[in-house]
């Protein structure tokens, strides 16, 4: 309950600290947040960091298969990539609410250069083995998880609160874009210059992230009560989520939507047994949600700020359910493409709404933990739904 009592004071403090940078009645355009210097810097840091992570993930999976020729080894490497989210995810939020977020971002990005550099040197020397890749992927994943909540939690302190939805949507759109482009970049690098070159690019991409984080003018310190790193802080975060019913309701809504509606693993069945479109059609089915997600983010950017964010979350969840029903009933390939595209649109809007609501309702010294819970919750729900 303490989190809710502190909320009005926190919101007033945020508006005082940030709204002076832009007039309260400024029209929020799709690119408005990018006009704010500190937001551009954190945007750049996240862009370079995400591109590096996705390039490394693709390159290591390709490399493991080249070294071992084993699908089982690929499964192990995939597990090592995902394991840090499970074991360290929540502690990233504790760090973000305890330490200087700006320095935490810079440190984790600095250290994230190490795995790519070691992978490149081991590859050039010809001594690389699968276990080297797996160990370095755990290290890289842990850094990503421990620094991730700080990258998200610092955003509200860099912009006016009226720009928060715009900023979150831009960040979400950028992250979706890196998921599409980074694997392509890695593939071309491997094909034309070799896998070691891809690792070298991955190693130095976080450098602009470090510089951008250090150039942010905001202090980076969480506002509010100073805490020590420990289990008590983690439990405090659980209590905040439990007592903040709006956030809890959004989590539950998302849980049931994804638990019973995680459709991606069954798309090969639709492509083969229902639509009879083969591998090319399957690729189109997997691409359609990504295109829909870009459209959904574009819709949010066009609208600027949305006042009734909770209501919109419910509406897009209903759209998700209806689109899932359309996919289940569709007997034609074109209808399936439309259905999964609508699923991508509704999911992108829902993700942006949840992130924005969490950022608004969580006090500044609770944002890291709330963000980490949201991330871990989404990851585990997707795994359960699959």
Model-derived features: positions:
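Flexible cytoplasmic inter-helical loops of multi-pass small-molecule transporters
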Residues: 17-23, 214-236
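Helix-loop boundary and gating motifs at the non-cytosolic
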Residues: 23-83, 239-289
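Hydrophobic core of transmembrane alpha-helices in multi-pass small-molecule transporters
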Residues: 47, 128-146, 255, 335-349
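Intracellular juxtamembrane helix-capping segments at the cytosolic ends
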Residues: 60, 146-159, 349-362
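Transmembrane alpha-helix termini and helix-breaking/packing motifs in multi-pass membrane transporters
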Residues: 61-68, 119-125, 181-201, 273-275, ...
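Helix-breaking motifs and short loop linkers at transmembrane-helix boundaries and internal kinks
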Residues: 68, 100, 122-123, 127, ...
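Hydrophobic alpha-helical transmembrane segments
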Residues: 130-141, 163-222, 280, 285-287, ...
């Amino acid at each position: 309950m303490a989190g809710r009592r502190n909320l009005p004071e926190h919101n007033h403090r945020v508006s005082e600290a940030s709204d002076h940078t832009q007039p309260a009645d400024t029209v929020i355009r799709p690119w408005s947040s990018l006009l704010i210097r500190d937001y551009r810097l954190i945007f750049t840091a996240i862009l370079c960091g995400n591109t590096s992570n996705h390039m490394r993930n693709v390159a290591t999976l390709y490399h493991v298969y080249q070294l071992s020729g084993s699908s089982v080894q690929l499964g192990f490497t995939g597990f090592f990539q995902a394991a840090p989210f499970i074991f360290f995810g929540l502690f990233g939020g504790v760090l973000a609410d305890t330490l200087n977020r700006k320095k935490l971002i810079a440190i984790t990005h600095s250290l994230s250069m190490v795995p790519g550099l070691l992978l490149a040197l081991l590859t050039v020397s010809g001594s690389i083995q699968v276990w080297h890749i797996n160990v370095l992927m755990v290290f890289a994943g842990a850094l990503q998880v421990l620094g991730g909540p700080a990258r998200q939690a610092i955003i509200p302190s860099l912009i006016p609160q009226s720009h928060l939805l715009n900023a979150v949507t831009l960040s979400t759109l950028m992250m979706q874009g890196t998921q599409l482009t980074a694997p392509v970049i890695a593939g071309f690098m491997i094909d034309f210059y070799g896998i070691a070159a891809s690792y070298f690019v991955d190693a130095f991409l976080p450098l602009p992230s470090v510089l951008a984080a250090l150039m942010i003018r905001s202090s980076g310190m969480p506002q509010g009560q100073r805490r020590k790193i420990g289990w008590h802080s983690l439990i405090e975060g659980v209590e905040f989520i439990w007592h903040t019913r709006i956030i809890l309701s959004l989590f539950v809504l998302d849980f049931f939507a994804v638990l019973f509606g995680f459709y991606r693993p069954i798309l090969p069945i639709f492509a083969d047994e229902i639509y009879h479109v083969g591998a090319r059609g399957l690729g189109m089915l997997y691409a359609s949600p990504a295109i829909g997600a870009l459209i959904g983010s574009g819709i949010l950017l066009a609208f600027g700020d949305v006042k009734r964010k909770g209501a919109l979350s419910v509406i897009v969840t209903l759209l998700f359910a209806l689109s899932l029903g359309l996919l289940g009933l569709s007997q034609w390939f074109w209808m399936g493409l439309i259905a999964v595209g609508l699923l991508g649109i509704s999911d992108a809007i829902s993700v942006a709404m949840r992130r924005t609501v969490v950022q608004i309702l969580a006090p500044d010294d609770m944002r890291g933990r709330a963000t980490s819970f949201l991330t871990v919750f989404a990851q585990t729900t997707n795994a359960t739904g699959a």
